Design a protein with these regions (language model features):
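Short, basic/glycine-rich phosphate-binding loops at helix/coil junctions
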Residues: 36-44, 144
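Segments forming oxygen-rich coordination pockets for charged ligands
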Residues: 27-28, 44-46
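N-terminal auxiliary segments of SAM/dcSAM-dependent transferases
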Residues: 1-39
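Glycine-/small-residue-rich active-site loops that bind phosphorylated ligands and cofactors
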Residues: 48, 151, 184
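Conserved SAM-binding loop and adjacent beta-strand
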Residues: 46-60
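C-terminal substrate-binding/active-site "lid" region of AdoMet-derived donor-dependent transferases
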Residues: 155-218
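The AdoMet/dcAdoMet-binding core of the Class I SAM-like
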Residues: 58, 62-170, 187, 209-211
């Protein structure tokens, strides 16, 4: 795990400080900064991880604080640096057996480099496309995080009824899905909400700026 100097940690409370830039297999440049003593992963168009301050998981997990002690297994689709797991570990002292899936090997490598996520030797990083992984997965999970973005867009398959049904099938009884999503229109939001409500027994919508976070109970 990369260590950040104390001087940079202190300076990061004033403005973001660049730690490195890395170009992935697809030619996209990813920037790693430390900001407010949190590691932040970004591209020119989006923030993909921001330590314990990553709203797509800090807000839903706070909402689920009474459920968190029961979370023994976690699947993350769209890992980024692994902020979802980082928040579980650092804010809630919870270390579930975890599978972190991302299509981008560069992001998985950065996750291992900057977040010390595997202290309990129960975390696996897998480079795979999310729908392919789900199609071939035979495990069950207490918690699934769905955070798939291409810049500021969510792939169409991630909002499809077929894919959401498959995720439902990967949850244990009383398992929970956290779905971070942006919509292009009110109509699209209504369609996706109807799909979720037709699959899961309880759906709660949380919001921060443009992002919608759905907490869906099996």
């Amino acid at each position: 795990m990369s260590k950040v100097s104390l001087i940079k940690k202190i300076g990061s409370y004033v403005y973001p400080l660049l730690l490195e830039e890395r170009t992935d297999y697809f030619g996209k440049v990813h920037r790693i900064d430390i900001y407010r003593n949190q590691i932040m992963l970004s591209t020119p168009s989006a923030i993909y991880s921001f330590g314990k301050s990553y709203y797509p998981f800090s807000i839903p997990l706070k909402h689920l604080k009474n459920d968190i002690p029961k979370i023994k297994s976690f699947l993350m689709l769209g890992t980024g640096l692994g902020s979802g797991l980082h928040i579980l570990q650092q804010q809630f002292n919870t270390y579930p057996k975890t599978t972190l899936v991302d299509l981008n090997q560069t992001l998985l490598d950065l996750s291992k480099q900057y977040f010390d996520l595997n202290t309990h030797h129960n975390v696996e990083w897998i480079c795979d496309e999310a729908s392919h992984f789900v199609d071939n997965c035979h495990e069950k999970y207490n918690l699934i995080g769905l955070d798939l973005f291409i810049d500021m867009s969510v792939p169409l398959f991630a909002k499809s009824e077929q894919f959401l049904l498959k995720l439902h099938g990967l949850l244990n009884q009383n398992g929970i899905l956290i779905f971070n999503v942006l919509f292009s229109s009110i109509n699209e939001m209504k369609i996706v909400e109807e799909r979720l409500e037709g699959i899961y027994k309880e759906v709660t919508r949380l919001k921060h700026d443009r992002n919608n976070f759905y907490v869906c109970r099996r």
